[in-house]
Amino acid sequence: MNAAATMEHTLTLLAERPIELRHGLYERFFAEFPARRAAFLCPEATSVRMTDETLQLLYGLAGGEKWVWPLVAELVATHQAYGDLPLGEYDAFVDMLVEELEAVLGIDWTEDQADAWHEQAEALKTMIGKAQAEWDHVLPRG
């Protein structure tokens, strides 16, 4: 099974769970970055959108989708409105999402799933870093 198929299987398993991935993800994120909580004016809406977008980006990367790069670049640009967001925070969010997937799936989480999700997470983090560097060149932060 290729990475995209493995990830699709993961998402199918996730959909069968009575748990929303976003709750644990945001508990983790706000525990590590408590100052960021204030930036979320409506966390119930924002957490759904950001979790779904990140899952879509990771899955899109696995499938070689061309829309991923423009969306990443746009998301990084729009996040500049929230002030200085260090690359480490983006990286931590992506890593936490994969960790939360593993936690939610428990015994159904396989080595193949871990490999697929971690590989795409690394690719996404690299892409976010590239987008941030390009935006900093044309629209410096601060």
Residue spans of the language-model regions?
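Globin-like tetrapyrrole-binding proteins
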Residues: M1-G142
